């Protein structure tokens, strides 16, 4: 095809795959969709991306971007042109005060943790696939993970983005020279962004609905919150990238705030005989705050009986045995579907503060019926096992489904 012939003029043949085997391999992600790309191109730089997008536009061919391919809903597969940005996209820089980090899309999330750990800082988004997922996918899919919630997801910690638009234009929203040039070359683009912003804000009901939608955990669909959060059109453009799944632009670099990493941590796996009781306990724990006004509970992850069964949780197996052989108060004989776990984490700046947090949580939970005693551990080798269970629960549940089904 003409596109391929032109692409070979600036992309070496060894980085262009058209054979059936490698196209099949690259047409796979962590979801259940199957699309086989016609061409796979391993990109190595921003200039290549710009030229590829302009070329695809001339030939009216769709293209899809892929980093690690750990997405669950088909974001990283294509039946047209698949542009891979993994290897050779691993650059980074950390600000002198360690409060900002600039990243290319191909660096793995776990690697970012390792880079920041010596400075007592961390990368806030923490998807379960963080040991494989890359920054490009984490940001563009708004993969918020288990602990960052809504207060520290990609949208909240993003400061600026360097992107390549469909026409090949490179825009760095954190660079004044780039912004000024873009205002000249894309004046109408900026005008339309501002018009959308003003229309959204003029509709009070819509604006309030958007604020509410993003006050709860929400990682699907295009991110509309920037239209009510920001005045500057370049801030809006940068934050529109979060959750866009690569449909609006290619993310070549992102600058994000880092988060303070508490040195003292403790976790507990709390078990309840009903999911209702577990949810009531979570609501109560959310109200706990320390002397400094910070939340006492930093993370609370609910695992239903199916999640526990999929990882052969020992407490679930014990519970299942008990209800089969005897009757537990408030539980129907043989009904194993009620047991619910809440993986709870608290963090502190000192061991004394950590002990105070644990006591406050234990006191709060005394008003609820737990299946097992509340037992926090501050030993990393112990609580890391709890979080490994949580990280592994999704693929484990998926593994229990019947062949050929998707749920």
Model-derived segments and spans:
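N-terminal flexible segment immediately upstream of the FAD-binding catalytic core
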Residues: 1-58, 68-99, 128, 151, ...
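N-terminal glycine-rich flavin-associated loop
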Residues: 7, 31-63, 81-128, 143-195, ...
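Glycine-rich, histidine-containing beta strand-loop boundary motifs that form or position
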Residues: 20, 65-69, 76, 105, ...
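Short, hydrophobic/aliphatic alpha-helical segments
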Residues: 49-62, 116-129, 133, 221-242, ...
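Short secondary-structure capping/junction motifs at helix and strand boundaries
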Residues: 62-66, 120-127, 297, 368-374
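Short, acidic, Ser/Thr-enriched surface-loop or helix-capping motifs
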Residues: 71, 96, 134, 165-166, ...
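Glycine-rich anion/phosphate-binding loop at the beta-strand->alpha-helix junction
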Residues: 134, 141-142
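C-terminal substrate-binding/cap subdomain adjacent to the FAD-binding core in PCMH-type
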Residues: 138-140, 147-154, 158-391, 395
